[in-house]
Amino acid sequence: YRLKYNKIINQVSERPFESDKGNDFVLKIFENSISKEKHYALVKNIKSLNESYPVRMHKLNIEKDIFAEKNIFGDEINHSFDVIEKHGSGAIVLINNDIAPNILKAFDQRQKKNNKLELREYGVGAQILKNIGIKKIILLSNSNKKIIALDGFDIEITEQQKI
């Protein structure tokens, strides 16, 4: 209820972002006003509320994303950059689970941790999407799970694309 009706995610900064995987992105940094966690969105060419954009909702995983540890999930971030570059627009929303201060503990518990987004995190991601002006998404995901939590935020999944 609070995630739907109370705005708890606020943009705190933004800057241009370019990498080997894509140019002309803007890195937007958001803060959860309750937990103080920082979340990130890499955004490219979002101009119309009526257009569907490719979006990757990604829960940050220190072992996989930073240290490139081998796992069964593949390279979703790099593939998402490729899809967005080909489309010419889109966003990668990076949901932080405040894991950075506890890197060693995260390594020890990686078998127990679920790397899927939880319902609470979809609410955070939905608030970020609304802030950057996205109402219709082409969800970039290898999961077949139907995400219904976004409906309450007036965000529509128009298509799902495997990455």
What is each of the regions a protein language model found here?
Residues Y1-I163:
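Catalytic domains of riboflavin
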